[in-house]
Design a protein with these regions (language model features):
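Membrane-interface junctions at the ends of membrane-embedded or membrane-associated helices
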Residues: 58-71, 153-162
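Hydrophobic alpha-helical transmembrane segments
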Residues: 117-147
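Hydrophobic cores of alpha-helical transmembrane segments in multi-pass inner/ER membrane proteins
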Residues: 46-61, 136-154
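Loop-to-helix transition at the N-terminal end of transmembrane alpha-helices
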Residues: 35-50
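N-terminal membrane topogenic signal
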Residues: 1-15, 72-76
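Juxtamembrane "helix-exit" motif on the non-cytosolic side of transmembrane helices
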Residues: 25-35, 90-99
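Alpha-helical transmembrane segments
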Residues: 11-24, 82-83
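Hydrophobic alpha-helical membrane-insertion segments
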Residues: 77-97
């Protein structure tokens, strides 16, 4: 086993961490500073790497907590990537799927909104909906799912490889 052969290892890899930074900077700085079509595309692009790896990491950590995790699976990676792609396609092209997505994420985000309101000494907010722009041209970022797939598969491959002995120069 390698150093990354643990549940959620893909959450420690550069593509995931870079996607987190891009999402944070884009959504909290760039969209406020200079909102345009490209800030939306940038969020979508980072999301194609972020969401499947997050989904896989949460799945693996849940299995590990239950004592049922048996290692990173290429199949789980593929399912998480496919699920992310399918949901993204639906919410960008289907009005009913988009409304469901907005309401569901608004409901899931509400507890965080309550904590934020409490922290700021504000009244409890109503359950809201998240913003979503239905734009079929956003589908152009789908090829970036390949980076998430590659990252997950690489973690899986490394987890099954035998540990490499230290080089002779490092043992001295």
């Amino acid at each position: 086993m390698t150093a990354h052969a643990h549940a959620g290892a893909q959450l420690t890899r550069a593509p995931f961490l870079l996607a987190v930074v891009v999402l944070a900077v884009n959504d909290h700085v760039l969209k406020a500073w200079c909102p345009s079509w490209w800030t939306g595309k940038l969020s979508d692009a980072a999301g194609m790497v972020f969401f499947p790896l997050l989904l896989q990491g949460v799945w693996e950590l849940a299995l590990e907590t239950l004592g049922r995790w048996q290692g990173t699976s290429r199949r789980v990676t593929a399912v998480c990537v496919a699920l992310t792609g399918a949901v993204f396609c639906l919410v960008k092209t289907n009005v009913h799927a988009a409304r469901w997505y907005q309401a569901t994420w608004g409901l899931l985000r509400w507890p965080l909104d309550v904590v934020a309101a409490w922290w700021r000494h504000q009244p409890v907010p109503r359950v809201g909906v998240v913003q979503l722009v239905m734009d079929p041209s956003d589908l152009m970022v789908l090829p970036l799912l390949g980076l998430a797939l590659w990252t997950g598969w690489r973690v899986s491959r490394e987890a099954t490889q035998a540990p490499q002995p230290a080089p002779a120069w490092a043992v001295r």
